[in-house]
From Swiss-Prot:
Residues 1-21 form the signal peptide. Residues 265-348 are cytoplasmic. The keyword Mitochondrion does not apply. The chain crosses the membrane at residues 246-264. CDD domains: IgC2_D2_LILR_KIR_like. Residues 220-239 are annotated as: Disordered. The keyword Disulfide bond applies. This is Killer cell immunoglobulin-like receptor 2DL1. GO terms for biological process: immune response; immune response-regulating signaling pathway; natural killer cell inhibitory signaling pathway. Its main location: membrane. GO terms for cellular component: plasma membrane.
Length: 348
């Protein structure tokens, strides 16, 4: 198999014609455009193909050009291999979708999987469209935002870009209304602001766009951030899901610990109060018992029976009574549960 290698000094790379090698042996490299993939006519653009695999060569391919492949020797720096494909003057013929591949020296016909596609577009060729926000450039957080791109030129497609994003949204132009062709881009509920631009293009030249519209700054009130997070870049406000799970788990543990401490404290308080009440009840019972013994002693009723009442004897005159005093016999009878004491004198 013969290969025809043609040196192209104006762009600093080689053009390789021949059979397409077998691909997919190594993992895909990455393809970037500097200063960007939207390039004005006659400007310089550099397409950089790089990988952490130490490729000896890099190949650049443009879709639709099956017989042409651009090849460069890779440079190795800090564990990365790369090659810069420089296009000094961008023209309409060089615009299109590019991919790059990597290969090693010992198997030049076995290349890596292709990189993700990169569209190189020439802008500034046609009249610029107009970009507006249906609710105005300042909206409340949560309101639905719709941006309208319109022009009197009969563009078939409109492209909406936002600063910081690598890819654009695109929508076909609607029917002509009031002399303009328009496309409405719904962005959904507003959470962050951003700067937007739109372009117009035709079906027969999808890589040739109009001039950029005037920039439109969309501001969202009620939100401290003024920039919309890019879908390809992580947001610092969103945070790492793992860290978020750790934060939620820690919060749950703290709440459970507080509840457990509260329940334990309440249980100990109830137990202490119950012990104090038992001691007070025992003291009250002892005090009541002592008061009962002091205030209500068992009264013993003594009854002194006077047998004079129950015996009959002869009453003598005082002069006839003996001079020695009589001896009275006193009999005490203990009457249980008596409330008073009575004394009955018994006479002999």
């Amino acid at each position: 198999m013969s290969l025809l290698v043609v040196s192209m000094a104006c762009v600093g790379f080689f053009l390789l014609q021949g059979a397409w090698p077998h691909e997919g042996v190594h993992r895909k490299p990455s393809l970037l455009a500097h200063p960007g993939r939207l390039v004005k006519s006659e400007e310089t653009v550099i397409l950089q193909c790089w990988s952490d695999v130490m490729f000896e060569h890099f190949l650049l391919h443009r879709e639709g050009m099956f017989n042409d492949t651009l090849r460069l020797i890779g440079e190795h720096h800090d564990g990365v291999s790369k090659a810069n494909f420089s296009i000094s003057r961008m023209t309409q013929d060089l615009a299109g979708t590019y991919r790059c591949y990597g290969s090693v020296t010992h198997s030049p016909y076995q290349v890596s999987a292709p990189s993700d596609p990169l569209d190189i577009v020439i802008i500034g060729l046609y009249e610029k469209p107009s970009l507006s926000a249906q609710l105005g450039p300042t909206v409340l957080a949560g309101e639905n935002v719709t941006l309208s791109c319109s022009s009197r030129s009969s563009y078939d497609m409109y492209h909406l870009s936002r600063e910081g994003e690598a890819h654009e949204r695109r929508l076909p132009a609607g029917p002509k209304v009031n002399g303009t062709f328009q496309a409405d881009f719904p962005l959904g509920p507003a959470t962050h602001g951003g700067t937007y631009r739109c372009f117009g293009s035709f079906h027969d030249s999808p890589y040739e766009w109009s001039k950029s519209s005037d920039p439109l700054l969309v501001s969202v009130t009620g939100n401290p951030s003024n920039s919309w997070p890019s879908p390809t870049e992580p947001s610092s406000k969103t945070g790492n899901p793992r860290h978020l799970h750790i934060l939620i788990g820690t919060s749950v543990v703290i709440i459970l610990f507080i509840l457990l401490f509260f329940l334990l404290h309440r249980w100990c308080s109830n137990k202490k109060n119950a012990a104090v009440m038992d001691q007070e009840s025992a003291g009250n019972r002892t005090a009541n018992s002592e008061d009962s013994d002091e205030q209500d002693p068992q009264e013993v009723t003594y009854t002194q029976l006077n047998h004079c009442v129950f015996t009959q004897r002869k009453i003598t005159r005082p002069s006839q009574r003996p001079k020695t005093p009589p001896t009275d016999i006193i009999v005490y009878t203990e009457l249980p549960n008596a409330e008073s004491r009575s004394k009955v004198v018994s006479c002999p």
